[in-house]
Amino acid sequence: MSELTISFFQSVNDYFDAAAPYTNLPDGLLDQIKACNSVYRMNYPVRIGDEYKVIEAYRVQHSHHRLPTKGGIRYSNHVNQDEVMALAALMSYKCAIVDVPFGGAKGGVKISPWDYDAQTLEKITRRYTMELIRRNCIGPSIDVPAPDYGTGAREMAWIYDTYRTFSGTDIDAAGCVTGKPESQSGVKGRTEATGRGVFYGIRECCSFADDMARVGLTEGIAGKTMVVQGMGNVGSYTAKISQDEGGVKIVGVGEVEGYVHNPDGIDIHDLIAYRTENDGSFEGYPGATYYPRDKREEVLELECDILVPAALENVINVENAERIRAKIIGEAANGPVTSGAQRILKQRDIIIIPDMFLNAGGVTVSYFEWLKNLSHMRFGRMEKRFNENVNKTLLDVLEQQTGKAVTERDRNVIARGADEIDLVRSGLEETMVSAYQQIREVYAQHPDIPDLRTAAFVVAINKIANDYMALGIFP
């Protein structure tokens, strides 16, 4: 079977099957973990002007070993059952890797959101939510959607309002969906979460001197060059945070209209501002060389230390894998590297940080938002002022004991209590760092495990298996 004929779901299962022998689990249990438990296909009408349009939509719940299930909703003309099943499976493994207590799920609506005005999109979204309610496929203890490609906080607010309308007695209704606006029980830091998680994951990978030496790089992320393909939410935040907090030099950026390249570095904030002012195009940007749409895929082949594909799946395949010149590939998108390309890149000693770990920042902060909704209180409200007062007292004692005054600037920095955004970022950093260390430990301790992706699957499979074995089989 050629690479082009292998479905996305089959590709995910191929990776699963490659990792399964390293778990020593019985075949029946592995089959249960791998299977999609529930697949819902919906066709519902929406009135648009004087006409009716039938909308094709899906919701897949891959695994019920933990509840609720969790996964985003994407709006795209390319949505199909196989894709949604694959993404739901990846969500199960992703949640297990980062110790988020959800089963995996995913939703999709087969439309191009850019073809509709806001009023029509609201109709489509609210009716989709109603279809989920009718099938008992949404709720804070059942299945919790989130944003994905083509959706955002606006759509999540519509979903929340629709669910709340039909579940008036559910005091935890806000927990039915995450990625909501902050004004509608959202959490600070959710918008940047996936991109920030990508940065934390890549930074942790670069912190191991032995691994960096193997690919001819020095320890640490600072000073490394990066190319980012895709300037959506994930790609833009990854680039901005990597530049601002990691000291990374962005040398190439690609999008649907083409790409820009400057080996001396590109100011990502300046580039994003230019593209916004230039009707969504890089063309004419003075800080780099622009290459048009027909050359856009060449951005993946630019020389760099770190390549971040942050758009769609299968962009790195057997046709271009030999031309990839990066030392590290950070899979910010879902499934950007095909299994055939992975084998080629492995032979070339290129490190691939797998998607099921690297883009888990979104579901991690969604978990924080869900917890906030169930507790009905923002993070930091109870302890912020207490911690500030304790810190001020400690500074006063320090000044008295040393006879030296702390500057007002230092006092403000040291004494400040953690706000919600600080706690969210800290929790995300801890999650990504500890998860990478678990994956690397499995990889390092088992020389027969070929790569980080296989190690990540081993970690995920073992954690899910432990849940199934602890729960038993009913009846």
Where in this protein do the model-derived segments appear?
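Short, Gly/Pro- and small/polar-rich lid/capping loops
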Residues: 2-41
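Adenosine-phosphate binding glycine-rich loop
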Residues: 2-7, 205-206, 322-323, 327-475
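Flexible, glycine/charged-enriched surface loops at secondary-structure junctions
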Residues: 26-32, 99, 137-146, 171-173, ...
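Glycine-rich, N-terminal phosphate-binding loop and its surrounding beta-alpha-beta segment
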Residues: 41-49, 54-113
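Glycine/serine-rich phosphate-binding loop and adjoining beta1-alpha1 elements at the start
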Residues: 76, 96-222
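Glycine-rich phosphate/diphosphate-binding loop of Rossmann-like nucleotide-binding domains
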Residues: 181, 185, 189-301
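Rossmann-like adenosine-cofactor binding region
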Residues: 258-352
